[in-house]
Amino acid sequence: MSCFSITGAIKNYAWGSRDYIKSLLSIESHGPLAEYWLGTHFLGEAKTEDGILLSEKIGHRLSFLFKVLAISTPLAIQCHPSKSQAQEGYLKESLLSLDDEERNYPDDSEKTEVVIALSDFTALYGFLPLEGIKENLSSFVPELFGKIKDSSSIKEVLETISNLSTEESRKILSQLEEKTGNTPPLSFTLGPKELCALCLSLYSDDIWCISPLLMNVVNLKANESLFIKPGIVHAYCRGNCLELMSSSDNMTRLGLTKRHVDEREFLKIAYLDSTPSLFLEAMETEEGAFSYSYKEAPFSLIRYEKGIHTLPRIKDGIIFSIEGKAILKKEDEEIEVGKGEAYYVGEDDKMMIEAQGSIFFAYGDCL
């Protein structure tokens, strides 16, 4: 059976949760744990039980990166590049080291993402129609509305905000705080007002605290999903999720972060038009599994909850248990996968999985 245990790479960013990944992986930690990477990206590669890098074990790199995210405070307003944008940006930054904090492009790959909620989950996704933006700004920050009321595009609005003086920004943020407060909301269902208050509680001098007035607020329940194409502006705000993406760590940030921000590059690659949320509905298979796939994504994901299923025949895949256990079977061989455990699955015929819980199978190309 071409299948073996792997351990992912943990990222301890400040926005992470102090309990979710710790509990999922049954590990000790005294600080926030934000992400758990399962893949072969050089900035955080999975390893086998004996410490060998996954790419060395299998002789190539995966076409996808599979992550767990545990979010206690909002991530940066961000977007990811297309293939051509990534290649151009990577070349432009060639004099910087690959782990330099100033880099937007640590690799030359496009970045498409699918996010699957594991709990109640809130995100900002794409821009509202221009009239919706103007209506929100008129209600919450008349000072800013007066400056953008004649704008004919979302790009004009963003450029106006980007060019505000420090004093102008201070007045607008003060007006926003009067309307929304700056206390983190206790409710898990968040709207624009609550998200502005949350952002102000963390980044009180960042003009992009107004972002929830410009963007779609999306609240997902567990197992609901969003598809994020290159260029789509987004920010995850609160909750736990799985993220399946092209094997890339490229991003440009607009604000709401202490990490590197590049407004000029962001406005260059972002899709600056209104964007309806692309919900990705899981399709139930004949065997009772749930498939997440999108024709523009170079990867797929299946959720198994119970029963016995035939795994698709693939080049590379990763099985990961969020809850419960699974048994991988081939002829007389069996491997048990417990909560928080991950297994690499290579090219193999007629492998079966018996699931009891919430088991996810991420994979790239089918054979």
List the model feature ranges, each with a label.
Residues 1-187, 258-277, 301:
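Transition-metal
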Residues 46-62, 126-127, 202-221, 312-314, ...:
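A short beta-strand-loop-beta hairpin characteristic of the jelly-roll/cupin
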Residues 73, 325-367:
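Generic C-terminus detector
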Residues 75, 113-123, 239-259, 299, ...:
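A short hydrophobic beta-strand segment most commonly corresponding to one strand
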Residues 167-213:
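Active-site cores enriched in adjacent His and Asp/Glu residues with nearby glycine-rich loops
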Residues 215-228, 232-237, 242, 331-350:
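Short acidic-glycine-tyrosine-enriched beta hairpin
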Residues 240-292:
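C-terminal, non-catalytic macromolecule-binding modules
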Residues 300-314:
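Conserved short histidine dyad/triad with adjacent acidic residue
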